[in-house]
């Protein structure tokens, strides 16, 4: 009995020691915090500088210009850098990679992106500070996260704490509109993941005390229907049938009734054209239709998106959609095609354990526990491409609101704290 009590007491003390270590900063970690604090204003000024360079995905020169700013900054902290060009026919700027190659601790892959949804013709172009809020196009999604990465690493470098670390930074140039084929546009990112132990994504934070252990994947779909062009007086007759628009209506209604409802599975028809003739421009996501009320529609097309938490869920949904499309109304035809975009990042045990390490850092800094964010409320991101190869977290970037809108903001009150947390977290991971 006495031996059992001693054994149980030793386990308790061991766990208590781990808890206390999680709640206390070491002397070195306190120096890291102080160093980050010394760069607080500089980090905000750098954020303003890169925000004021338009880098909409299709503004290739703008994306490269933002990449050059980060390239120069990483070189000053002794990272080797390279720009990965994309083939001209892909019409994408390319990606920035920066790395140091030591042999201590976990091999880290830090992911961001240089492009934004705000193209060169957007009226929202400049950084404007109002007290602790910065109105910033692409500042929250996600130049703020890129700056978090840079200044966390800068603090560690200045304290000579990166000497033996192995870290790769990957800032893609087409996250908002991924270049196709993905086998080319994401090859270097995936290769970097295969050589790493952990991937950390710095997409916008969903809350100071949240991080992302899972993200839904994204896929495109297109339904095309065909009907018999005829005078509308004969619609529904055996000779004329229902027409292309009624067939499309049937399909979309059955999608809603029969595919909808599974947790984390959503699908959305984004645009719909129908009539005698339709013309759709994919690059502009717009089109036109011509038809008359006294003519049965001969064609219709809808483009949509599908979001899912696993490949199994995606394929099951696709199978249901195909079966629905195949069951035609009289004298109509229909086809459905799918386009892969982002894979899913599943909520693995390893990701949950990594979240606990981040939470320990947060508590040690006095910021409180970090919990997992609901994947059903997040979109897709680049970290999903590497989730099959490494454990990871996302949502570690800047806080703000209004992403992808003319009211996009960065919360400067929390900006420095997030850099502190990242710097200490990276330090601990490179010492594991």
Language-model regions, residue ranges each:
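Short, flexible, mixed-charge acidic loops at enzyme active sites
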Residues: 119-129, 214-218, 282-287
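Acidic/histidine-rich catalytic neighborhood of metal-dependent amide-processing enzymes
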Residues: 142-218, 277-284, 430-432
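Acidic/His- and Gly-rich active-site-bordering loop/insert found
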Residues: 23-137, 157-162
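Short Gly/Pro-enriched turn/cap motifs at secondary-structure boundaries
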Residues: 86-89, 211-215, 292-295, 374-376
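Short glycine/proline-enriched loop/turn "hinge" motifs that connect secondary-structure elements
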Residues: 118, 161, 213-217, 293-297, ...
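Metal-dependent amide/peptide-bond hydrolase catalytic core
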Residues: 23-31, 45, 55, 73, ...
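Bacterial Sec-dependent N-terminal signal peptides
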Residues: 1-25
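Alpha-helical metal-binding/catalytic segments enriched in His/Glu/Asp
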Residues: 110, 130-180, 221-225, 234-258, ...
